[in-house]
């Protein structure tokens, strides 16, 4: 009976999205329906996560067809902590949108498309079937295509074209990889694939397939293939930029972690050094971007790229500590990047400018923004006891164990550069004076302060409750790095199957 609840985090937003299509002229009902739906989704996800931590992973086989023949959803520590975190930030993002009137009269059916994107994101985390992962990716991407093209500026349309083209190429590669892998192993269920690939051992065809998946997921995670991200994020409104920054690249990073710990772990000698190299390149590119621009929205976009480099560096170490740190940092970064884009969007709203020179001592007039920005900087920089610290320490440890001293050095340097770029903004927030010009600051709406306060509290709480979160991420790491344990807990009936 409990396993049936596993469908609800995806089903509830889907049903809500359909209902909202017919409520385009009733803002009040739409608001309460959405917020209620996502709040319930978050609570259910958290309850399932607590159960899994105390007992064992949950599986749901649709239509009574057991794996590997039927569609299977898996609720383990990794998938459920991602679903819980994603549901929580989606709730805040939509509350932000309703607060600023973006959803008034259900404009462009915006809430529905955000919910459809949420369905794809949550489904990607829960599915234990390769083809259904592709389906969830496509649901997510189709909704994101609509969201990124909502606007009338030429700049936004140009960014949308780049985003759409690169993601379509990534989807083609993903589908190609699925076809080749099915031809090779004859199954699409994750645990069954892992078992058959282990039986095959080292194989050139499998190596080629793993490289195809690596490129496909790298495009979605902005790992080296980042060209779409800065332009796309810079032209989106605050709500959508926060949504994309918090979730879109993280789904790609999640797929990389799931695939290259559980499925293709027998190709460690090739894939993991390649992942570490790509992570290093991504960190360097991100670091160059954050110091090259004065546009605070582009600085925020390149911060996303740096964080992806950190996460994949942990995966590339191929150590328990490094992978554990990557998962912890992945979860933390969803919340931190939501906070970053909310703050940046609010600064643009208040001043009317995207350049940090025009902040003109804003933090003196609005201390909350100064405090929130400082906490966010420390979380991004991994300063103890803030939320970024445990993940970075574990990634450092993994890099040391792996002997990847270059990656370790680059992570330290790029962390300092990331903090420097944000401290530069903070300086103008306290001491800025754009040639003595007067900047008329808009009054900050109360709902922005409330949402920022919630996110700041959560960021602090993650740092304080790090042992609790690490217990979850450690279980996730253990399950996904042990094929036998995964097989035993998820699909024990497949044991010994030809």
Curated annotation (Swiss-Prot):
Keywords, comma-separated and alphabetical: Antiport, Cell membrane, Ion transport, Membrane, Transmembrane, Transmembrane helix, Transport
MF GO annotations: antiporter activity; NADH dehydrogenase (ubiquinone) activity
GO biological process, one term: ATP synthesis coupled electron transport
Cellular location(s): Cell membrane
Membrane topology (UniProt): Multi-pass membrane protein
Key word Ion transport present: yes
Subunit composition and interactions: May form a heterooligomeric complex that consists of seven subunits: mnhA2, mnhB2, mnhC2, mnhD2, mnhE2, mnhF2 and mnhG2.
Protein name: Putative antiporter subunit mnhD2
Provenance organism: Staphylococcus aureus (strain NCTC 8325 / PS 47)
Lineage of origin: Bacteria, Bacillati, Bacillota, Bacilli, Bacillales
Protein encoded by which gene: mnhD2
